[in-house]
Each structure stands twice: as C-alpha cells, then as structure tokens.
Amino acid sequence: MQYGAAAAEQAWYMPAAAMVVAAAAETAAERVERLASESAVVVFSVSSCCMCHAVKRLFCGMGVHPAVHELDLDPRGRDLERALARLVGAGGAAAAAVPVVFIGGKLVGAMDRVMAAHINGSLVPLLKEAGALWL
C-alpha cells in the first residue's frame, strides 16, 4: 500500500468501497507506522489515562500540538494497542503501552522515555529537528 503523495494522487479515482477494503487490509502495525509519520509529533493515547493526559499537557505546555490518536475511541484501537505494546516492549500488556510518542516519525517510547528526554534536555532538540518547535 502506498502512502503520502503517491497515495493521494491515486486516491482521486479509487472508488470509496475500494478505499474501505484497502484500509481494512492494512495491519495494525502498518497503521501505527502510517499514523506516526503523518505529523511531527504523534501521541497514541487512551482518553481516560492520566499518564496520557500528562504527556499531552507536557507537549501543549511547550507549545507543541501533537496529533493525538485516542485508541479507546477507535474501532480498531485494541489492535493498535497490541501493536504499540510490541513496539515499546510491553510484552503485550496494552495498559502499559500508552501513551506512546513518535517524534519525526521515530518512536520515542512511552511516558518514561519522554520524561527522561525532557529531563536530560534531549526532547527540545528532537522537537526542533522534527519541525514541531521553531524557537
């Protein structure tokens, strides 16, 4: 499946039913990869998770407005949670898998990694490199 400009060029003539079938054929891992690359900062979250709320507030407080994907509101959210748990090494424990943050399309990790990067000063350069911060 193609993404980005190539997909947009082809989408104009693809029937809606074919787009739905193509989206359904996309695996959870492929969907995570696609969503993670669509914005400078992407947060996979669960709306009732306090750690997810904290990481979103951290970014907003820095002037960064991430793309947030609330997995509990997504019909395929459970599959995405499992794929994210595998990515961050949570051993399939979906509760431990969120929040998951991508910056510049690259996996930063869960809350512990984001906070460690913030504390050690490496978060701001990552955000600048991804184009999420200008100052």
Swiss-Prot record:
Which top-level group of life is the source organism from?
A: Eukaryota
Which Gene Ontology cellular component terms are annotated? cytoplasm; nucleus
Compartment annotation: Cytoplasm; Nucleus
Sorted alphabetically, which keywords does the UniProt record give?
Cytoplasm, Disulfide bond, Electron transport, Nucleus, Redox-active center, Transport
> From the record, which residues define motif Responsive for interaction with TGA factors?
132-135
| Stored Gene3D superfamilies | Glutaredoxin (3.40.30.10)
A single Pfam family it belongs to is Glutaredoxin
What are the annotated disulfide bridges? 49-52
Q: Which PROSITE patterns match?
A: GLUTAREDOXIN_2 (PS51354)
**Main location group:** cytoplasm
InterPro entries (alphabetical): GlrX-like_pln_2, Glutaredoxin, Thioredoxin-like_sf
Ranges where the Glutaredoxin domain occurs: 29-134
Enumerate the PANTHER family for this protein: GLUTAREDOXIN
Function description: Has a glutathione-disulfide oxidoreductase activity in the presence of NADPH and glutathione reductase. Reduces low molecular weight disulfides and proteins.
Family listed: Belongs to the glutaredoxin family. CC-type subfamily.
What's the protein name? Answer: Glutaredoxin-C5
Which source organism does the UniProt entry give? Oryza sativa subsp. japonica
Lineage here is: Eukaryota, Viridiplantae, Streptophyta, Embryophyta, Tracheophyta
